Structures are given as C-alpha cells and as structure tokens.
Amino acid sequence: MLKLENISLKIAANPLFSKLNLEVDAGQVTTVMGPSGCGKSSLLAHLCGTLPSVFQTSGKIILHARTLNNLAPHERKLGILFQDDLLFPHLSVGENLAFALPAKIKQQERRAKVEQALEEIELSGMCERDPASLSGGQRARVALMRTLLAQPEALLLDEPFSKLDQELRGRFRKLVFAHAVKNQLPTLLVTHDPADARAAGGDILSL
C-alpha cells in the first residue's frame, strides 16, 4: 500500500493544495485531478524525492510500511512515467531496457529479460533499433517496460497519455493499467483529463 498522510507543499509559504491524505492499495489506480499549475506534478516529484528545495513540505509518505521521506530517490523504489518517454537517444531500444535492470542480473539473463519485455509489448526483434526510429506509441511502450524492469514497488503516472493521439491513448492506457494490476503495484495517476480518470477505474481526488 502507498499511503500519504497530511501531505502539504508550499512555495513562499503559500500552500499549493489542502493537506492530502490517501491510501492506494496494491493493484489499484487512484487518480489525482486538477488544472495546470495546481501542484499535481510537484506532488509526484515530492514522492520521488526530486522536488526542488524552494518548496516547503510536510506530512509522511509510506510505502509498504516504509517511510520514504528521508530516503534518496533510488532507495524509494518508485517507478514513474512522464508525458515524454525520456528514452536515452545514445542507446539502442534494448540498451534502454537493460539500463533499468538491477546490477545483480548478469549478461545472458539480462538479454533474456529484455527480449521477453519486447515480446510482451509486441516489439520483438527491435532490440538493436534506434529509439528515434520508433513511433510515438512504440516509444511509450518501451518507456513503460523500462520502468517495470526496474522492479518498482509503486507506480506514478505524470500524464503519460497526454501526447498520444486518441486511438493510441486508449490502447496505451489499457496496457499501463493492466500491468499495474498484474504486478500488484499501488498506482497514482495525475491528469487533467476525465477520460483518463474514468479508464483508471479507481478513486478520484481533486486538488
């Protein structure tokens, strides 16, 4: 379970939103909605431990009984998908995926896991491809699998569907939510689009 207790973000002593309390169970997708500038992305940055120091914060972030507030970003075991896929342009598709794998996984197993991930998203045979040669929908799928290969314990979604066209958006949404359920990941989606919130099927909170 991902649990937020009395989370508050302020900048220059001005609160971005009222104190936030929520619980997200394993395999559940909870949506946080609100207009641009209300603090949705800042909330996710705070959860990840990457919020700029200009913000003042309070409250507790708890994941599976671990308090995350004082942990470094890489110790929090949170996966995040952004609006942009953020694939490394100097690495192949396969190398992008392998980058996320824990160091304890060695060469042959790494290759097998990368190929399995590509097969799972219907991109078999694209291991050596340049990410720039992929379509937007293909890049989005690779970004999702890279996030999951890092073995996160919760998933954060920062409007990852917003730059896709309507057809791709619906298909990618289904894929992301299906993997959240399959991997039993507490998932927090921030969006301004009611269609995303409806598709998530979980609780909806407005900032």
Model-derived segments and spans:
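Catalytic Walker B motif of ABC-type/P-loop ATPase nucleotide-binding domains
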Residues: 155-159
